[in-house]
Amino acid sequence: MKKRLTRVISTVLFTGMLGVTSAYATPSTTYWTTAVIDVQPYGVWHLGIDNYFTVLKDTPDAGAFPTDLGLTVGVLPYEKIQLEVGVDLLETLIDSSTGEDNPLFLNFKFGTPEGSLFPGSPGIAAGMWNIGTKSDVTNYNIFHAMAGKSIPQIGRIHIGAYSGNKDLLKSSTGKEEATGFMIGWDRWLVKDKFMIAADYASGDNAVGGGGAGLYWFFAPNASMLMGPVFFNDDGINGEWKWTTQLDVNF
């Protein structure tokens, strides 16, 4: 997972039959969701370039999300209290009703690592993501809180919940789906080289879904993720998609 590179991710989601686009931008993630306790280290910048696309699909099921460019940095010089802030650029994110481009999203996350509160304590993180710049279009303003713990021979497990703008977090049928739970897991297959990760978010909305994939750490400060992502509401996000995610710390 992105826990070693603790990155920013945002994913464009769309409802093709309505000609509408929406998006969400997140802080450090596991795979598809923010189900992770990690926070970007102080003074370390992170660049993420993420793509999602269908595989061997014919129209109208074929499609791809616009490429996401995300930048994040840790801003607190403390070991036990950490904070990251990030921005994502999603071009072109056009509101079909007005023709306006609303590509920028902000996010932040506070956290404290495992063992910082007392011996054996879980890591804890909380923050907001998909802080959009256009009211009633991109301001999902989703709050999330997570707790995570390393378990020998199993890996790390992260559990938490999210809640956002009830006017935007809805199903494809218009039902309010503003809250849900998230769970994530990651484990090294080969230390500092290959890692497997999986996650899931509940809710028939733009957030709901998950998947599992493989991280290849091809350099000390860089990784590539590949794997499938599945969605709870195909009416919002379309068919399942393959993701490739490049992450670089500097």
Label each PLM-derived region with a short phrase:
Residues 1-29:
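Cleavable N-terminal export/targeting peptides
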Residues 205-206:
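Generic helix N-cap/helix-start motif at coil->alpha-helix transitions
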Residues 156-160:
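Alpha-helical interaction elements
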Residues 161-181:
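Glycine-rich phosphate-binding "P-loop"
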Residues 24-143, 148-153, 163-167, 186, ...:
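Transmembrane beta-barrel domains of Gram-negative outer membranes and organellar outer membranes
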